[in-house]
């Protein structure tokens, strides 16, 4: 963070993506824009009493003063406020600082734009700093942005008061060390009770740092550790708290089977677990017990290359209440594993089988027969899926989202089966090389479709996109 913003806010560049928003450091971005106000001409009529004085309506006659923009009193174009006749009705606030108007107006701006607008004047900042405008956003702070360099070369921690005013419940810290985390806890007033979610990415946090963070920040219930290679499984044993309900661990080289043992024993209230670890085996999944079975509803096993159908057996028996399951990149899972999932996890609403090269059409038959509540199915890079598999899916009346990216055997005939999915809202066919313009044009029958992805499809021509714009006007077509 190169310099502090208003109230000492750090000002990194803006990066809105996947729910993460970096607070920007631009100067006042309004340029020469101004709000104007004028007074219409009036004539005295000798036989009529003069009309009562009224507030001048907005026009383009004269610019609003800088003081008015900053929240000061507004002076009409006809003269100073002191020249108004006695008994003149009280002035309304100028439109530029009318909080009722601003509260409605600011909803139309992105998070990055709000950061710039908050620097216009105190009145705008006061309105924009209400927590309602920042709900669901997570500030992303890099290690170098946490400090200001003083003239003597010393560093001081930035003022985070502006973050507290906006009521952020989560932070993402990138490239931080144990010391940086301790400084954050000491300098952010809400760190111990007000922060509910912490994400550490590409950081050098150790077992000791992880333990201190979770011990001091008693409000944290959602934790993400990504690319942190200095903590070990022993650190998880010593630091994890039963209050944690959501845990995500990815690209941390010291995470293996024993980490799952710690998670299963120390987190009885865990509702969501996302794990990307190349060294986790079927043995780890045997650690899950009935304790997690009642609370855990989401499990994502991403690129866990060593997990086989035996591991899937442990999952379906220990976690029967799952509503979302991802086996993305679990390349040893076969149709038999999918059959176990379909027969035992009847509450599933989301299933991700992407990058499972051993999955065939038979797996889709199991899914269609047993998972009647399924709303989302991800089959990206399942290269053995053919039109026959899509024919099984045509009976799934609840399916709303279907991803078939780079399913290289899907052809036009398979698309005809999808036309029976009247509830489908999102369809991705990116990278399917055998689909023709004729086959794709038939998708206009899916009138409820809201998003259609056709990137890298040879059959997706400019004429086809024009055809979709005419016949699927409410659908976002991604070229």
Curated annotation (Swiss-Prot):
SUPFAM superfamilies assigned: F-box domain, RNI-like
Signal peptide start and end residues: none
InterPro entries recorded: F-box-like_dom_sf, F-box_LRR-repeat, Leu-rich_rpt, Leu-rich_rpt_Cys-con_subtyp, LRR_dom_sf
Residue span of region Disordered: 1-62
Residues in F-box domain copies: 94-139
Omega-N-methylarginine: modified positions: 92
Keywords from the named record: Leucine-rich repeat, Methylation, Repeat, Ubl conjugation pathway
Residue stretches of biased makeup (Pro residues): 47-60
Record has Repeat as a keyword: yes
LRR repeat windows: 244-266, 267-290, 319-343, 345-369, 371-395, 396-420, 446-470
Keyword Ribonucleoprotein attached: no
Cellular-component GO terms for this entry: cytosol; SCF ubiquitin ligase complex
Transmembrane segments: none
GO biological process terms, semicolon-separated: SCF-dependent proteasomal ubiquitin-dependent protein catabolic process
Its job: Substrate-recognition component of the SCF (SKP1-CUL1-F-box protein)-type E3 ubiquitin ligase complex.
Subunit structure: Interacts with SKP1 and CUL1.
Stated name of the protein: F-box/LRR-repeat protein 16
Species in which this protein is naturally found: Homo sapiens (Human)
